[in-house]
Design a protein with these regions (language model features):
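N-terminal hydrophobic targeting/anchoring segments and the immediately downstream early-domain regions
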Residues: 2-186, 236, 240-392
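Alpha-helix-loop-beta-strand connector modules within alpha/beta enzyme cores
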Residues: 111, 186-203, 220-230, 358-361
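Distinct, well-ordered alpha-helical segments
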Residues: 151-155, 178, 215-226
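Short, contiguous, pocket-lining structural segments
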Residues: 185-192, 208-216, 245
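Surface-exposed cleft-lining segments at the edges of enzyme active sites
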Residues: 203-206, 308-309
Length: 392
């Protein structure tokens, strides 16, 4: 089980042995992150036009307003990123389809704008080649099944455009799948929801079970013929939050072959932050506002006179990583930071430059470099290959 540190590894000098080992390791192996919301953050700066969004901020210099830019990514040793083509649940039907296509184009624009930094890839082999050439292998992940507007045709189009996974829900239920942060409506997946999972298997699109209800997780794993992923979730047993993964589901991953990519979101990893968020949710409900609407939540908290928000730490994230390893096994874990998808990240993991700090902490706790390499990206690449092998 997880034991507390006697100190904070992120406060130690950058020259410490563990951090040097972590940096050297991440120079040699692909570090893959399952979820980054930079495309939507750029839309917030530049508007819905993908060209203007991609050009709204110069990512070659440090951007204090962002968790992600190329100097930070270089320091963080990131080798492979699933860029989220996220669409808020407020978009429905045709507007959701339009928005997700715009977000796909934002990523394409970024790759064209920064060809010396990014390379658009769709396979594990292409990702490894991009890494060898000094580029960040860039893949796309759709967040929220509402973005296909109940159309298998739209799902197939997204895959044709390079989208490699789809999160079955976001914060609200779809008409065919239950979300973890909504009231149960379907008992997990409807028959159409099961058809969506089967079609994703067929076309080589990974089934992402972050955000969904445990009943949906179990149903999707039962239906899926290939490994599933959780692109950015943590462990319910460590912090009982509806966005996390119960132990019985983690225990299914060795049989399924899937990967739980542990996230850094403070409310998901820290019980103290989760309790603070419950107070915020209650205050918003009293004011007649919807907590699950991320835009409304951000505005509300600016003027809220509630208690100060507690801080999550690297130690909190380590607790989830080690619990997932204990229950699912070392071959079934990865990382999905959710950078630029939340306002702040834990101390020591504040932005995308900080990945080596996490690996230094794990090395200090006795992790082998081989196990760190599996967590970093080897497991995720295996799943990508298995999904593609079934589709072919």
């Amino acid at each position: 089980m997880y034991e507390s540190y006697t100190g904070h590894p992120y406060d130690r000098p950058m020259t410490n042995e563990a951090l040097q080992r972590a940096t050297k390791l991440l120079d040699a192996v692909i570090l893959a992150d399952g979820h980054n919301d930079l495309p939507w953050e750029l839309r917030q700066h530049g508007g819905p036009n993908p060209v203007e969004a991609a050009a709204s901020l110069d990512l070659t210099v440090r951007q204090p307003a962002l968790h992600t830019d190329f100097p930070k990514l270089a320091d963080g040793k990131l080798g492979m990123q699933f860029w989220s083509v996220y669409v808020p649940c407020e978009f429905e039907g045709h507007s959701a389809v339009t928005a997700v296509l715009e977000q796909v184009e934002v990523v394409h624009q970024l790759v064209e704008r920064y060809p010396d930094r990014l390379r658009l890839v769709t396979t594990a082999d292409e990702a490894e080649a991009a890494f060898a050439d000094g580029r960040i292998a860039s893949l796309l992940g759709a967040e929220g099944g509402h973005s296909i507007a109940e159309s298998i045709g739209v799902l197939r189009i997204l895959r044709r455009l390079g989208v490699r996974y789809m999160t079955l829900t976001h914060n609200f239920n779809t008409t065919w799948a239950d979300a973890g942060t909504d009231e149960p409506a379907h008992g997990g997946l409807t028959e159409f929801g099961r058809d969506v999972v089967r079609e994703m298997n067929k076309i080589g699109m990974m089934v992402d079970l972050s955000h969904v209800a445990p009943s949906t997780m179990r149903a999707a794993i039962e239906v899926s013929s290939v490994p599933v992923i959780f692109s950015h979730s943590s462990c319910t047993a460590v912090n009982d939050h509806p966005r996390n993964i119960p132990d019985d589901v983690l225990a299914k991953l060795p049989g399924n072959g899937g990967v739980a990519m542990i996230t850094f979101v403070p409310a998901f990893v820290s019980p103290k932050v989760a309790a603070w968020n419950e107070q915020l949710e209650a205050a918003m409900a009293e004011a007649g506002q919807e907590y699950r609407n991320l835009t409304l939540r951000g505005k509300f908290v600016q003027d809220w006179d509630g208690p100060p928000k507690p801080l999550a730490t690297v130690e909190d994230v380590v607790a989830h990583v080690e619990h997932a390893r204990e229950v699912a096994g070392i071959d079934h874990i990865g990382l999905g930071g959710d950078y630029d998808g939340v306002g702040s990240l834990p101390e020591g993991l504040e932005d995308t430059s900080k990945y080596p700090v996490l690996f230094a902490a794990l090395l200090e706790r006795g992790w082998s470099e081989d196990d760190c390499a599996k967590l970093a990206g080897r497991n995720t690449l295996r799943v990508l290959r298995e999904v593609d092998g079934f589709a072919r």
